[in-house]
């Protein structure tokens, strides 16, 4: 999700494993570019491996703290900045996209079989959300 306007940037359907979501996130972030970008995520993203991979790609991890019986993977270099304080609100916007997909986009229950078809329908629903969001953004500026 793009933070400024809440638009879906990329989608990826993965098998339900404990690490698939993090692996897909690393694949979807851009390679080393000129500008530093951030990646927001929930507690699942607060791991040493993911933070290391993101920093190698010049991506700043803005992940929720996972304080259950271990130390944080993100250090004070990241958490002290004002942009990090904005990340929880942006993460909520990302969850709103999935809420829209489940209620309006009819993706609460998978109605198709086959990974390729389910992936296509997920991307199609994300595009529908994108169009709905674009309509609101254009209407707000008119």
Could you tell me what each predicted segment is?
Residues 26-28, 80, 117-118, 127:
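Short, charged/polar low-complexity linear motifs in solvent-exposed/disordered segments
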Residues 1-53, 123, 129, 134-137:
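Polybasic low-complexity intrinsically disordered regions
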Residues 43-120:
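Helix-centered, glycine/charged polyanion-binding patches within enzymatic domains
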Residues 104, 108-110, 135-142:
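A short, flexible helix-boundary coil/loop motif
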